[in-house]
Amino acid sequence: MNNDDIAGRLQAVIARHLAPPGTPHNLRQLTGGANRSTWSFDAEAGGAIHHLIMQHGGATEDLATGLVPQLEPEQDARLMIAASEIGVPAPKVRAILEPADGLGHGYVTTHVAGETLGQRIVRDEKFAGARAVMATQCGEILAATHRIDLPRVPFLMRLRPGVPARRFQVLSCDQVLSCADDNPQPD
């Protein structure tokens, strides 16, 4: 699917979820994401420009293996909605994609300005002030997530903490050992 196809399909999403309906502009794919695609775009609606993000995709095959504790994109969106309703900072979910949209599983949120690359946050002096308060803020936000009403997000109950991660670690170690066996190191 090319950018024009995606923009055309986003037009229908915007028409359903922005009042008044708008037109997508400046569509560009962002870097990052191992199994999901993230796009930035602007939507002009009612004389205002809305800066938005669409994230879609996700490998349901990974969920079936139980190796990686991962949520479906729709579940991510529903978790962001539940979190923001109790005051946890989260992007505002503007739309959850539907099959008729032809964009796969995903959602559209407001764009949140900021830096996402950990290396820049750790090394760039302009983030020194943020680094001074970040651990405290992250702890407060993480603690606040415990106030989410679990019946609102029942899909979280299927994740058993640690079990999928341990399986993944064992698989990773086995793969590393297998590679080491195939590539003997010099004495």
Role assignments for model-derived ranges:
Residues 12, 16, 78-81, 187:
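A conserved long alpha-helix in the C-terminal portion of kinase-like catalytic domains
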Residues 22, 184-185:
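Residue-level signal for secondary-structure boundary elements
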Residues 1-21:
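Juxta-kinase regulatory segment immediately upstream of eukaryotic protein kinase catalytic domains
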Residues 7, 11, 169-177:
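An amphipathic alpha-helix signature
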Residues 21-28:
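Conserved N-terminal boundary motif of the eukaryotic protein kinase catalytic domain
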Residues 28-170, 178-184:
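ATP-binding pocket architecture of kinase catalytic cores
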